[in-house]
Regions:
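Acidic, polar-rich N-terminal leader regions of halophilic archaeal proteins
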Residues: 1-77
């Protein structure tokens, strides 16, 4: 999964969001077209998000790049 951020259709760094990032993540996913990919950068692994993604038809792959940095590649199926 180690690609540059430029390789994705959209990137959202949730670490820069004050408060709960769920709404911003859902907004970013709404903008994705079929086959497009969002790179979500977070300070923790967002395990509760995975069920929501699957329910909405998205696939995901997670890579921990530092102790407090996770890259979640989310693709619209």
């Amino acid at each position: 999964m180690a690609q540059s951020a430029d390789a994705y259709d959209a990137t959202l760094d949730a670490r820069e969001i004050d408060g709960e990032p769920f709404g911003a993540i859902m907004d970013a996913l709404t903008d994705l077209q079929s086959g497009e990919t969002l790179l979500l950068i977070n300070s923790f692994e967002p395990e509760p998000l995975y069920d929501v993604l699957e329910e909405r038809g998205f696939t995901h792959e997670t890579e921990q790049v530092d102790p407090e940095e996770f890259h979640i590649e989310i693709q619209h199926a």
